[in-house]
Each structure stands twice: as structure tokens, then as C-alpha cells.
Amino acid sequence: MKFRFLPLFLVFFFVCFSGQGFKEPPGVVIDHLSKSTEKYIGSPAICVLPDGSYVASHDEFGPRSAEFYSAITHIFVSRDKGKTWQKTATLDGQFWSNLFVHQGMLYILGTNKHHGNIVIRKSTDGGLTWTQPYDATHGLIVEGEYHTAPTPVVVHNGRIWRAVEYATGKSSQWGKRYSAMMISAPVNADLLKAESWTKSNSLPYDSTYLDGKFEAWLEGNAVLTPDGHMEDILRIHAPNLPDEYCAVVNISKDGKKASFDSKDFYRMPGASKKFTIRFDPVTQKYLSLVNTIETGYEGKTSTDRIRNAVSLISSTDLRNWKIEQRLLFHEDYRLHAFQYIDWQFDGKDIVFVSRTASEDNNGDAHSAHDANYMTFHRADDFRTLISH
């Protein structure tokens, strides 16, 4: 038998361009957008339905996206615990949104565009079809300019709570325009009606915070403290500081007043990037999955741009945080990232989704920030990872 040998340049061509010359990111790929589209994957969110199905979503941002006039969000469903996913819906006019179940119904809450109105939609069939938020009785709940991210809703004291940021300020500059605030509604109210929702006052940017190094607070989490008070815990953008901080804003029982003491900044690993905090009633600890800055990466760039590691962290008091276990890591931080993690408990496991930047069959991602994948991950038996 004779063997025919291909010229070396053809071997190189087939290896590099056959679609097999790159390694897919870890986890299960839910969706992918090539950088050639000039659309990037943002705002990953996940929810576990009462029947055990998973629903996930992401939006699109970037030069060729519709983020500034009527943003697009895609909905996906998995009925096999995240092994496979099917796209079930595309929502026109939905951005920066989280998914949640309330009284057996599935909701998505965010804005209609970049710095848009706050809108909410309901699905009664597990994410296949959704209501349209076209007026104040059908999901257009707060008009104006607002900012948010896939952060949690919390039910407490007969109300459902969600942190957002007012995005009209003295400055139109990113970060400086954001004011911390909370919205809430009675648990038995019609969440699609604007009249059901109460807004707190908004707390604006203050250049004197953190000895003048404060540049923004954003992407707040509604969190119930150990002693039963509602707080808005926010990501802090302070790129000229070596440490990462969160801010803790106090919310009154009726949801109408937000207040802040300039001493209420606390060191928190990963808090210069978006995070989601949830309480685990079994361990009696608050948990989050955050972008830690690993040894050797300190000072390579501003803290908010280092997103190549995901770690489980815990706290008993929301003031002191401990890194428990690294879950994901890539040695490169410029073109690789696992970011904007949203997560849920599922029995003994944590399930989470990531806005992931990694190479694909078109080469590298546009940047670590401009992600080309949404990926699904599972932390098995997560309580064994937590120190006691």
C-alpha cells in the first residue's frame, strides 16, 4: 500500500482552519456569537423552575447590537440538568435582566435598552412565550434611565425586593451617572403593574468616597442581613485602588428610604466586578461566585479587568469574606474571562452561567470583556468546599 503525504503548508491549513484547531471553553456551551458579528454576549442569568428545568438568558451588546434602542435577549431551556440547551424565545426590548420564579410563575426583569425603562415580563409556560411590556399595566414598571444587571430578587416582610441604579445624574459619564436605589412590591401584587412597585430615593455618586478614589457604584444586590434588614450591596469601581470593595446601602422597612454611611465600604474579593450574593440556609452563610485576582496577577491591570478566575467565597455577616475554592481559571486574562456569573442552588449543587471569552473557530475573542460564549457550569456538592 502506498501512502501519499500532503505538503506541510496544507497540513498546517487543515489543522488551523478545519474547525478543530481550538479548544472549547470549560462547561457546556449554551450559545456562541463570533466576534465577526460585532455583537457580544452579556448579562447571563439562570433560574431553576419548580419542575427542575433550567432557564437561562443572555443579551447582546456591541457595535452592531440593538442595545441603545431596543435590546435583544435570548432565552434557553434545559430539561436534562444543563447537559443540553434549546433556544425557546428572543425578546425584543429586554436588557441587563435577571430571571426568577415568584408564586410558581417565571419572570424576567431588567431594562428595555442601555439606560432604559425598567420592564418586567411573565411566562406561564416555562420560558416559551412571554408577555410584552408595552404600558404601565403590562410590565413597563418604571420610566426613565436606569441601569442594572442579573442580580437577585429577595422576598422579605411581605414584599419582593430588587436593587437597581438610577442612571440620570449631574454627569452623563459612565459610573458617575449611577445612583443606588431599590424597588419593591407586595408579594401578592400584580408585578406587571407599575402601581404595584415602590421606589426608594436614589443615592448619587460622591467623589469624596474612598479618599477620592471612588468612581462608581453599580449592579447592586438586594440582600437580607442576619438580623432581618434589607441592604443593597453594590460593586465598587475604584480602579486606582489595589483592593476590591463593596458598598452597603441600608433600605428602610417600607422600601422608601435608602441611606449610606461613608464608612460602609468593605473589602470583598471580586467586588470590582459584577457579583450575585445568595444565602445558604444549610451552612447559614452568604455565598457568591466572584472573579478573584489570583497570585501573580495583582497590578497587571486595573482590578475590574481581571476576570480569568472564578472562586466561591463565603461570609457569615456580609462584612467579612473568605475565599473558599477556585472553580474556574485560565492563565491568560487579556483574551479570556469567566464573568458576570449568575447562579442558583440546585439541591447539593450550585449551577451557574458565565459570560465567557475564549477562542473559537475565528481565533481569539475580541477581548476578555467582549465575550463570545455563554457557558453553563456545575459545582457538585458545594457545601463540601466550604470551611466550617
Predicted features along the sequence, with ranges:
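Short alpha-helix at the nucleotide-sugar/activated-sugar donor binding site of glycosyltransferases
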Residues: 344
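Beta-rich carbohydrate-recognition and catalytic domains
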Residues: 20-43, 47-95, 100-149, 154-219, ...
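Alpha-helical scaffolding within the catalytic cores
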Residues: 273-274
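Bacterial Sec-dependent N-terminal signal peptides
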Residues: 1-23
